[in-house]
Amino acid sequence: MTKTLPKDFIFGGATAAYQAEGATKTDGKGPVAWDKYLEDNYWYTAEPASDFYNRYPVDLKLAEEYNVNGIRISIAWSRVFPTGYGEVNRKGVEYYHNLFAECHKRGVEPFVTLHHFDTPEALHSNGDFLNRDNIDHFVAYAAFCFEEFPEVNYWTTFNEIGPIGDGQYLVGKFPPGIQYDLAKVFQSHHNMMVSHARAVKLYKDKGYKGEIGVVHALPTKYPYDPANPDDVRAAELEDIIHNKFILDATYLGRYSEKTMEGVQHILAANGGELDLREEDFSILEAAKDLNDFLGINYYMSDWMQAFDGETEIIHNGKGEKGSSKYQIKGVGRREAPVNVPKTDWDWIIYPQGLYDQIMRVKADYPNYKKIYITENGLGYKDEFVDGTVYDDGRIDYVKKHLEVISDAISDGANVKGYFIWSLMDVFSWSNGYEKRYGLFYVDFETQERYPKKSAHWYKKVAETQVID
């Protein structure tokens, strides 16, 4: 049976400042930790990315032509405050006014994120969100943006608090490149959630007319053998690290007893302790019912097996299928069932996981209000042939995820939109330019855009709301 989506459903495309804009030193933009980190550790940099800084009118015209009626954009904090606080860079501010005006001119609603992995270098090098001073700096930056950009109707505070802690302090593929420090992972999650709560409370206290929420990456975790209590426990603990800890902070305003028991178990095995203060919980509690929406980024699920050894994580950054490894002391290891498909980067393709995650949020956090799927898509080594890409694999991936969103809506979940990652090809944090996600192919040499087969398909789905 052909499935459909509601008439008012947003069919969006997602971007992020650092991954799309390029122009990393242009018009007074301050440095971010990624600038040097990429130069020192990777085979690529964020120049020129998709040159969105100059070419946004082209991308927004394409969005309009292909029925993409929403776009995720992030403001580069260091374009507005080059050192993270203090003096405002008016050229940066002007750029975003122009960008938002172009969005509205093209009928593409901007959903604007304040922080998408790009803390200004001056603040990142003094501890990023492990340093509580930076909570204050973030809230001041948020306050400035809320006041400066009344044309923005949809705000999100952070993109993917979970993967920031994970990338910076567990896997170590994000600056500062620290590995296996679970206490820092949880402390980063917590301090960023306090920052989020303070910004949301401020937005509501000031009476701004728009909506505000947060974007969480929520990869669903399953036990490898559901009949084995040790595998079930491994999945629960892995879920706490990546999902439950931050969801509790968002919607309960505290960490449930079960969540904290799991956190203590993980820290007992790995060392370290957390600094959780009474005033933190006051603000989390005050903000828990103020979120207007939840953004869910979903790409994959994981299966967890009991494991009794030392921590070892190998990140597959080059698309060499089967090269990744993930096992955490006191938690478990990832072990995928043989019949589940994977991408070249070992990301497990499992649309049912998105359905299960949406329904989990609905069941466990009934104050969620509404959901947007703020990122979902397929990274591929696209082959450019005859001026296009015949990306049937991407179409199939997106189709199956849209179908389970339709199912979730039928089953009572309030899901209002979907943003494909990504609108056009962008640079990928730990994979560079080889891993492409866009509806529009970008020739990074010439910066020309070419619609892929998926763009034509997505246009039709957006036009008809029929998933065909």
UniProtKB/Swiss-Prot annotation:
Residue positions of the active site: E160, E375
GO biological process, one term: lactose catabolic process via tagatose-6-phosphate
EC number(s) per entry: 3.2.1.85
PROSITE patterns recorded: GLYCOSYL_HYDROL_F1_1 (PS00572), GLYCOSYL_HYDROL_F1_2 (PS00653)
Keywords of this entry: Glycosidase, Hydrolase
Presence of the UniProt keyword Cell membrane in the record: no
Reaction catalyzed: a 6-phospho-beta-D-galactoside + H2O = D-galactose 6-phosphate + an alcohol
Pathway of action: Carbohydrate metabolism; lactose degradation; D-galactose 6-phosphate and beta-D-glucose from lactose 6-phosphate: step 1/1
Binding locations of D-galactose 6-phosphate: Q19, H116, N159, E160, N297, S428, W429, K435, Y437
GO cellular component: cytosol
InterPro entries assigned to the protein according to its UniProt record, in alphabetical order: 6P-beta-galactosidase (IPR005928), Glyco_hydro_1 (IPR001360), Glyco_hydro_1_AS (IPR018120), Glyco_hydro_1_N_CS (IPR033132), Glycoside_hydrolase_SF (IPR017853)
Molecular-function GO terms, alphabetical: 6-phospho-beta-galactosidase activity; beta-glucosidase activity
Pfam families membership: Glyco_hydro_1
Family to which this protein belongs: Belongs to the glycosyl hydrolase 1 family.
Name recorded for this polypeptide: 6-phospho-beta-galactosidase
Lineage, top ranks: Bacteria, Bacillati, Bacillota, Bacilli, Lactobacillales
